Amino acid sequence: MARAVGIDLGTTNSVVAVLEGGDPVVVANSEGSRTTPSVVAFARNGEVLVGQPAKNQAVTNVDRTIRSVKRHMGTDWTVEIDGKNYTPQEISARTLQKLKRDAEAYLGEDITDAVITVPAYFNDAQRQATKEAGQIAGLNVLRIVNEPTAAALAYGLDKGEKEQTILVFDLGGGTFDVSLLEIGDGVVEVRATSGDNHLGGDDWDERIVTWLVDKFKASAGIDLTKDKMAMQRLREAAEKAKIELSSSQSTSINLPYITVDADKNPLFLDEQLTRAEFQKITQDLLDRTRKPFQSVIKDAGVSVSDIDHVVLVGGSTRMPAVTDLVKELTGGKEPNKGVNPDEVVAVGAALQAGVLKGEVKDVLLLDVTPLSLGIETKGGVMTKLIERNTTIPTKRSETFTTADDNQPSVQIQVYQGEREIASHNKLLGSFELTGIPPAPRGVPQIEVTFDIDANGIVHVTAKDKGTGKENTIKIQEGSGLSKEEIDRMIKDAEAHADEDKKRREEADVRNQAESLVYQTEKFVKEQREPAEGSEKVVSDETLSKVDEAISEAKKALEGTDIGAIKAAMEKLGEQSQALGQAIYEAAAAKAQADGAEGGAGSADSDVVDAEVVDEEKDSK
């Protein structure tokens, strides 16, 4: 049975994990790191770089490097590269493809099934887009799981049968979630969840960037925001400074040659940022985490003292100010230090993959929908059919009627959110139920059913009870991709995978050819210019043939025809072998001649053919 992986598709970093003998293992990527930057770059030569290689070249390729695309999931955002528009799903699929390849290299087998995590507060459009990204990457997405739920699963499964209440505080690179869960006897049940899909470590980085821009403008009189390359260097320096301030009281930000003045003289940026100053400029960001925390406690109907454990998830929770705030909010409770905040979500996803594949027994995961779902009714009111924090999968029906006499159809507009006025919420999609027989208003009976599957993806049906006519919508409008578009993107991704494979093979052939040319040139030089005391043993004719093959190989390497490089390499290999054989034959002939000479000169001497002395034996 093919194995399934768990993937934490993060805003700034992504992680893949797999079960080995029932235990989750985080898979290191091809660069040797356990986390992969969620960065995709389109190099000028047509190559697509993913992860650390993409991040490394960001400064010199700003316009063609895409990061933090998770913040655009479920929207109509696109980025244009070389005349082609890429959706967030396609960019995310590149990251997923790399994680898939790295996991396949580790396991030595193909992988198709995966559990992918999303922030608990992701709406339907964002979940649908994540699933589509998985499909484009060639993955069968078994389940979309909420990140805090996955973290609780990873944390709580080995904690015995005693029922416990766990608070998961998840502050990642681009999103924030807080969830309250109950774990006991193999059941992980989410009681309540809340969050902010536009709050994360990226925002803390951006504050440092703004602070540096203001400082530089005050000292040098130059606005760096107009220089894309300088801004990219500032972002990288800001991220580094933020990390350093988690363990130090101050950090030095030194960027030589950041820009030039009016006279083309190079200018340097050199600033000292203290932890106190950093906390001051980001205090409002920190305060934004309070409301979701209080909302979760209220929705779950518990008090802070009922919380048994606090689990921190996401690299941003390493900031001391975040840890201190969590302690304050939970009444002084010390957050659990036994989990790696960067890896725990992927570990939980791998466990859930094991549950779905039957490798992990006696575990039941009960997740919730993060936002209320409803339809727009007369007066633009949001009528909720499913309240937030309802355990999923779930199905709810309610009967509505017409607003006007002889109304032939009804427009069903599906919204997600907590506002009382429908238009203030997120419109997920709309569809029409037609063919309603003429009748006074209030007479037709229209049954609207909401069905949320285990991935948190919504299906809505409207049925006229009188005629039995019905219409169904699987909410997809939010992601903006039709099935045809997804299929096209899958084909594109497969084509790119073949292209990437071909590119790697081409690079291997080129490297082999260059190496063979270098080694053979060195060998020929040694034969032409023998060391002192040695003599030339190979004819000029043989060496000339090798020289000719070297020239052909060099010429082929100047071009891009891999077939020509292979042919030239084959010919050079043959000539190189012929050279080796000529050297061997010359050496053998010389040895024979020397032997004959030696034999004639010592015919009368006493020759001992072989005498073996065992010193150890003689000494006994």
From Swiss-Prot:
What is the protein named? Chaperone protein DnaK
Gene coding for it: dnaK
Give a GO molecular function annotation for the protein. ATP-dependent protein folding chaperone
Instruction: Read off the NCBIfam families from this record.
Output: PRK00290.1, prok_dnaK
Q: Residues of the signal sequence? A: none
Which Pfam families did the record assign?
A: HSP70
Positions carrying Phosphothreonine are: T175
User: InterPro entries this protein is in?
Assistant: ATPase_NBD, Chaperone_DnaK, Heat_shock_70_CS, HSP70_C_sf, HSP70_peptide-bd_sf, Hsp_70_fam
Q: Which organism is it from?
A: Mycobacteroides abscessus (strain ATCC 19977 / DSM 44196 / CCUG 20993 / CIP 104536 / JCM 13569 / NCTC 13031 / TMC 1543 / L948)
Q: Identify the Gene3D superfamilies for this entry.
A: 1.20.1270.10, 3.30.30.30, 3.30.420.40, Actin, Chain A, domain 4 (3.90.640.10), Substrate Binding Domain Of DNAk, Chain A, domain 1 (2.60.34.10)
Compositionally biased tracts (Acidic residues):
606-620
According to its UniProt entry, the function of this protein is described as: Acts as a chaperone.
